[in-house]
Amino acid sequence: MGGKVTCTLGEVKNRADFIIYWGGNPADCHPLHFTRYTLTPKGKHVPLGRKGRTMVLVDVRETPSVKFSDIFLQVRPGKDFEVLTTLRALLKGRPVDEARVAETGLDLAVLQDLIERMKKARFGVIFFGMGLTMTRGKHLNSAAVLSLVAELNAFTKFVCMPVRGHGNVTGADVVMRWSTGYPFGVSLSRGYPRFNPGEFSTVDVLVRRDNDAALILGADPGATMPQPAIDHLASIPTVVLDPKVTHTSRLARVHITTAVTGISAPGTVYRMDEIPLPLKPILRSPYPTDEEVIRRIREKVKEMPAWLPASFAAVPCA
């Protein structure tokens, strides 16, 4: 796997005639996605709008997004990776065990029909959400989607894009990527970046209780992460920078109120297709910006002398 084949949301609006949502519920989580970019808008190469597009929804249960889809495929929980690898095998003309496919909750004929539709599309796109990336398989599921899309380009134009959560999640990934070469799951503990999802990912580090402190900026893991991770955050010195009270700030040792980016502080957010959007403040705030707080913390850390915990102190030779 050598990266992702992607595009902007504007290209999706103007070109995509075959749209797949996998492991997401955009009707609730991204209610304007359908009307602005994917289903209903009329594009340059899709002049009929909704009539010229086909939408497929893949999920483990029926959600409000089902009523907007043309095809709904209900996969058994934890079987997304098997479905993706089956689609890749069918794309390459490899033999597939029908009994194994049935374990995913889908018939082989259904997947054969899907892969043929994908190959015949003029411009296809897969939007994949946390129902795929945060279930069994995690980053391997994402890798399977990226590989499938790359291989589909031997037949037609196909792209993919993660459907991100709230806040500037894409921005954090983009900055991490151009500064370290990796988008997430990065450890700098040795003085240089190391990438290993599953080991250095935030959830995994917290669940294993590998860290003894936490600094959280503009996020609320206390509302979304597994309970073992939340319990660990509550048991260690946790510092939260956030303009409002959240589940995480309630369990933190320190909560520093900061100015709201885009309202009281300038900044840049990245859309889910990685397009940067500059933000200008419109109101004044008595609170410092996130950048100011981090800069002051960094200055104080620089003033501290080098130290080692007592457990790491050198033992004198006998």
Predicted regions and their residues:
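Non-catalytic alpha/beta scaffold blocks inside enzyme catalytic domains
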Residues: 1-155, 179-318
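Short, conserved secondary-structure transition motifs
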Residues: 156-177
